[in-house]
């Protein structure tokens, strides 16, 4: 050494591995501050849809809805059983003399004439319609067909326009204290510093006596940061040190600064999860109003009733002109019909007859095939913000975001309390074993002497480990030392005990610039099933579904009240014989004419999609047969009404009641079916005579030829009932208790990255960003080809002008088309730049967006917090369309069946209406039908659990090298 200056020699070998030190004393616990303002919502992408939650509990019985509208006219019902013969009516008055009768019947065919010469070939074309054949016997009911396969899914509807941004929500109530989060993910290991120059190996000296500890020297000036060195080999892991005891609870700290309430950008729509389990069967709905009477069924024709008393013969009218006799022979031309006679006047209406017994219900019809699924509706406007949901189970952490640029250095904070002792660091490599020194007695620590004038010598060889000294008392916490250099990252320790929930700190300054977003990560693992959320508000009514296919024939409903007479329709063609109207005065018995041919069937209506088959209901018990009631007295004869216009071709209605209604008799057993009587002889219609006794009902004549189809008459007036107003919503139920925590799901396989989605609609203009820092002028790149013209975006607010750059003014270039956004370039191979001068601290910016959530540690999830308060009820949505008809309610013991509605006859004298019969037993419920078309989009549901983390994003560009930190405090002396 020259002039007393020691020259450092080469660095010696590393010493042996040191023993783990004793656990440090626990530091005092920090003060718990008041809870801070709620932070702004995150802006990360919405995760995939979580697994379906457990089936919810059955809701309370809803209020009885408004009676539904009458359904579509059902298919023709089966022909009922033959009714019992009616009682003999009273003799009617003698009818008046009738008008001229119709043409006489066609004469018998004469003998066959000689065979004629072959005629000329007639024009080609369709021949006349032949007469319908006799009705065959009804076939046995076939088995129900198998349920058809579900139709293909309908095409996806067009995406709706972007919704308007919702209003800023009100400040939410402070939620319950959530469970402590698990340990965060292990950070990226920092690069080790460059190795120092190796000193010269000096001779191993004898261990000297323990010197007095020197005084703490002044902090040296920060040195120049060296170039980053290569990473060294990872050393072996040291033993885990024991955890220190928890410190005392500190006082409450100062309240944190309020967080920003700016609303985050909406994330993309998550992937639709698997369908949830089928819910439990709902409550039986209120019974709807009876539907209109169905068309007549295809059953067999009933037998004739009992023959009535013959009426008095009327005065014979003049005989009508005889028709032309047909030409003899099969090939002869058909004779032309004679002229039609004048129709007779309408007779007086007779008394109302007794009501016949109802027929037994027929078999159910088959279920129709399912209709095609409708197109998806367009999304509706955003609904009101829902109530705050309960705290869900801790989700998986999201993907790590791109590294941002370093922020401005903040002011030096107030020294905090010392933290808990951290895990032991990595052990260094074992050095050469030094010579063992003599074990001296453990001396007591002396007072600190003054600092010596010499420089710090080279470290001597490590001596043998001495005896552990007595643990000293805890000293007063000193001032916070300057931050030392970052050490190597230790092994990940075991999760410690759950600490006290600390107050949220104040929002930090926002970074000067935000890095470019990383690439979309692959979908992560599926998170555990969350707890079932509270019952949401009532959703908007869905759109009216398509009309369902006619379901199975249900039990006949009760006979509704007689509606008001409809307006007179246009005179139509002659239709088939309707049901017998009120008996008029008996006229002279005329000869029955030929029955007209039945008209062609009307056009079939549009087939709706199949309705949902109901669950089979319980079969009711048969009712007791009652005794037959006595016939009531005849009512007074009404005045003769003017002949009304011929009505449209109506469905055969029920048999009209005869005579005024007496007390209702019990339903008797169906009688045996009678045989069809032969047709009566053909006679001329006489004028109506005076009213005679009421005759018994004669047998029906043979079926005539089908007549031309009648025209459809005008629709009848609406019923007298008023449209009811929708019922008010019931009171909101109390929030349910949180369910038990679900078990953790198995770890899913990471799926492959999905295809890139189509470009969405242009978003709404975002808020103006802060002016960015002035960056260095980049080198001019080559001009790329013009990209395709994109759709015009919405005009955003004008941004603040940035500072003017130092570049020279260039020549004006041509306006190029905007090119597509290029991929992020790789980091260039250039050397790191020289450290820049420390910048002046900038103003505190707004609070930055919440960072991505860290990975979940191995610790168990904490207990679920208490349920949050239920939010206020949302606005009442529009009235929904009529829902599907609920299950058929249980019927009473007895009930009459309603007949088929026939065309209105001439007005008779109104009889007294008897009370309705008791309800009969319920029929079996039909099978469930296929689902109807989807309804409108409901309100936004509660947010689902946080999805699994995506893959790690690309590493951001390296930021500029910061200024070197001050040197750290000297370490504790090694063992003697």
Curated annotation (Swiss-Prot):
Compartmental location: Secreted; Secreted, Extracellular space; Secreted, Extracellular space, Extracellular matrix
Pfam (any one): Collagen
Basic and acidic residues bias locations: 58-72, 879-893
Gene Ontology, cellular component aspect: extracellular matrix; extracellular space
Residues bearing attached sugar chains per UniProt: 94, 894
Single biological process term from Gene Ontology: extracellular matrix organization
Biased composition annotated in UniProt, kind: Pro residues: 152-164, 785-795, 829-844, 961-976
4-hydroxyproline, modified sites: 20, 23, 26, 35, 38, 41, 55, 70, 76, 85, 91, 118, 132, 153, 162, 165, 192, 195, 207, 213, 222, 228, 231, 246, 255, 258, 266, 275, 290, 296, 304, 310, 328, 337, 343, 349, 358, 361, 370, 379, 385, 397, 406, 415, 418, 436, 453, 459, 465, 471, 477, 483, 495, 504, 517, 523, 532, 550, 565, 571, 592, 598, 601, 610, 616, 634, 643, 652, 664, 670, 679, 688, 691, 718, 726, 735, 753, 762, 765, 771, 786, 792, 798, 806, 812, 832, 835, 838, 907, 910, 928, 943, 949, 964, 967, 970, 973, 976
Listed Gly residues bias regions: 294-308
Sites bearing Phosphoserine, chain numbering: 1, 100, 580
Segments for region (Disordered): 1-976
Any one GO molecular-function label of the UniProt entry: extracellular matrix structural constituent conferring tensile strength
Record-listed 3-hydroxyproline modification sites: 678, 948, 963, 966, 969
Posttranslational modification: Contains mostly 4-hydroxyproline. Proline residues at the third position of the tripeptide repeating unit (G-X-Y) are hydroxylated in some or all of the chains.
The keyword Glycoprotein belongs to this UniProt entry's keyword annotation: yes
The keyword Metal-binding appears for this protein: no
Modified residue annotations for 5-hydroxylysine: 94, 249, 319, 544, 655, 821, 882, 894
Expressing tissues: Expressed in bones.
Coiled coil spans: none
Composition-biased stretches (Low complexity): 108-118, 132-150, 198-237, 352-378, 387-406, 465-474, 577-591, 604-631, 660-676, 723-735, 864-878, 910-943
Keywords of the record: Extinct organism protein, Extracellular matrix, Glycoprotein, Hydroxylation, Phosphoprotein, Secreted
Family: Belongs to the fibrillar collagen family.
Job of this protein: Type I collagen is a member of group I collagen (fibrillar forming collagen).
Assembly behavior: Trimers of one alpha 2(I) and two alpha 1(I) chains.
Note: These protein fragments were extracted from an ancient mandible bone collected in Haiti.
Name the UniProt record assigns to this protein: Collagen alpha-1(I) chain
């Amino acid at each position: 050494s020259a002039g007393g200056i020691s020259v450092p020699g080469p660095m010696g070998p590393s010493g042996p591995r040191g023993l783990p030190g004793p656990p440090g004393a626990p530091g005092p616990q920090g003060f718990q501050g008041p809870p801070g303002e709620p932070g702004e919502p995150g802006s990360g992408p919405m995760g995939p849809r979580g697994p379906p939650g457990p089936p919810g509990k059955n809701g309370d019985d809803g209020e009885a809805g408004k009676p539904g509208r009458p359904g579509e006219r059902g298919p023709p019902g089966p022909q009922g059983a033959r009714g019992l013969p009616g009682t003999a009516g009273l003799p009617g008055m003698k009818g008046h003399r009738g008008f001229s009768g119709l043409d006489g019947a066609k004469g018998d065919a004469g003998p066959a004439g000689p065979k004629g010469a072959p005629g000329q070939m007639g024009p080609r074309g369709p021949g006349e319609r032949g007469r319908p054949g006799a009705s065959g016997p009804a076939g046995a009911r076939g088995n129900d067909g198998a349920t058809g396969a579900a139709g293909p899914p309908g095409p996806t509807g067009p995406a709706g326009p972007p919704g308007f941004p919702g209003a800023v929500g009100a400040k939410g109530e402070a939620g319950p204290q959530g469970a402590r989060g698990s340990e965060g993910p292990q950070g990226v290991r920092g690069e080790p510093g460059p190795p120092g120059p190796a000193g010269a190996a000096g001779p191993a000296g004898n261990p000297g006596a323990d010197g007095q500890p020197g005084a703490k020297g002044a902090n040296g000036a920060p040195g120049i940061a060296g170039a980053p060195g290569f990473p060294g080999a990872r050393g072996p892991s040291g033993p885990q040190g024991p955890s220190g005891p928890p410190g005392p609870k500190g006082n409450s700290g100062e309240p944190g600064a309020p967080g920003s309430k700016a609303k985050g950008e909406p994330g993309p729509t998550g992937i639709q999860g698997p369908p949830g389990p089928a819910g439990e069967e709902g409550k039986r709905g209120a019974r709807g109003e009876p539907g209109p009477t169905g068309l007549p069924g295809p059953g067999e024709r009933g037998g004739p009733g009992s023959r009535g008393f013959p009426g008095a013969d009327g005065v014979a009218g003049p005989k009508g002109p005889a028709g032309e006799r047909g030409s003899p022979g099969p090939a002869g031309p058909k004779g032309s019909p004679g002229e039609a006679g004048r129709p007779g006047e309408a007779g007086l209406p007779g008394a109302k007859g007794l009501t016949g017994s109802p027929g037994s219900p027929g078999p159910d019809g088959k279920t129709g095939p399912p209709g095609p699924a409708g197109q998806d509706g367009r999304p509706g406007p955003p609904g009101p913000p829902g109530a705050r949901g309960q705290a869900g189970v801790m989700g998986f952490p999201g993907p790590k975001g791109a590294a941002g640029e370093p922020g401005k250095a903040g002011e030096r904070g107030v020294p905090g309390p010392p933290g808990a002792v951290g895990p032991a660091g990595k052990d260094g490599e074992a050095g050469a074993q030094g010579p063992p020194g003599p074990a001296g007695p453990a001396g007591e620590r002396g007072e600190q002497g003054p600092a010596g004038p010499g420089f710090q010598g080279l470290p001597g060889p490590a001596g043998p480990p001495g005896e552990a000294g007595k643990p000293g008392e805890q000293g007063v916490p000193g001032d916070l030392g300057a931050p030392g250099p970052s050490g190597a990252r230790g092994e990940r320790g075991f999760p410690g005990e759950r600490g006290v929930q600390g107050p949220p700190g104040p929002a930090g300054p926002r970074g000067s610039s935000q890095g470019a977003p990383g690439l979309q990560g692959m979908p992560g693992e599926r998170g555990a099933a969350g707890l079932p959320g509270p019952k949401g508000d009532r959703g908007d009514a869905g759109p009216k579904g398509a009309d369902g296919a006619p379901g199975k024939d249900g039990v006949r409903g009760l006979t509704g009240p007689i509606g008001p007479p409809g307006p007179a329709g246009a005179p139509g063609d002659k239709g088939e014989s309707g049901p017998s109207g009120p008996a008029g005065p008996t006229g002279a018995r005329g000869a029955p004419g030929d029955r007209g041919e039945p008209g062609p069937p009307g056009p079939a209506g549009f087939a709706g999609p199949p309705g949902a088959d109901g669950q089979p209901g319980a079969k009711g018990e048969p009712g007791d047969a009652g005794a037959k009631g006595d016939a009531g007295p005849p009512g007074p004869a009404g005045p003769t009404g003017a002949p009304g216009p011929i009505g449209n071709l109506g469905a055969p209605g029920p048999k009209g009641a005869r005579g005024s209604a007496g007390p209702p008799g019990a339903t008797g057993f169906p009688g045996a079916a009678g045989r069809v009587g032969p047709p009566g002889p053909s006679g001329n219609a006489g004028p109506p005579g005076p009213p005679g006794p009421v005759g018994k009902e004669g047998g029906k004549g043979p079926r005539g030829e089908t007549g031309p189809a009648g025209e459809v008459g005008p629709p009848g007036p609406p019923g007298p009932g008023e449209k009811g107003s929708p019922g008010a919503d019931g009171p909101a139920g109390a929030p349910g208790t949180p369910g038990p925590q679900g078990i953790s799901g198995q770890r899913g396989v990471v799926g492959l990255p999905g295809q890139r989605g189509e470009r969405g609609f242009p978003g709404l203009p975002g808020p103006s960003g802060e002016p960015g820092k002035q960056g260095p002028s980049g080198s001019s790149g080559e001009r790329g080809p013009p990209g395709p013209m994109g759709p015009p975006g919405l005009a955003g607010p004008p941004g603040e002008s940035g500072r003017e750059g130092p570049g020279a003014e260039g020549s004006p270039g041509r306006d190029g088309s905007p090119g597509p956004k290029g991929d992020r370039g790789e980091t260039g191979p250039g050397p790191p730049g020289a450290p820049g001068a420390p910048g002046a601290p900038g103003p505190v910016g707004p609070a930055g967006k919440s960072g991505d959530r860290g990975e979940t540690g191995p610790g168990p999830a904490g207990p679920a917090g208490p349920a949050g308060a239920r939010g206020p009820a949302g606005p009442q949505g529009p009235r929904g369309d009529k829902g599907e008809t609920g299950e058929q309610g249980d019927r009473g013991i007895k009930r009459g069946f309603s007949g088929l509605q026939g065309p209105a006859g001439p007005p008779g004298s109104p009889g007294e209406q008897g009370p309705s019969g008791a309800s009969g037993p319920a029929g079996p419920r039909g099978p469930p039908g296929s689902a109807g078309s989807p309804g409108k989009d409901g309100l936004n549901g509660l947010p689902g659990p946080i999805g699994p983390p995506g893959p790690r994003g690309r590493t951001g560009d390296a930021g500029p090298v910061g200024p070197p930190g001050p040197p750290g405090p000297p370490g504790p002396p090694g063992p003697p």
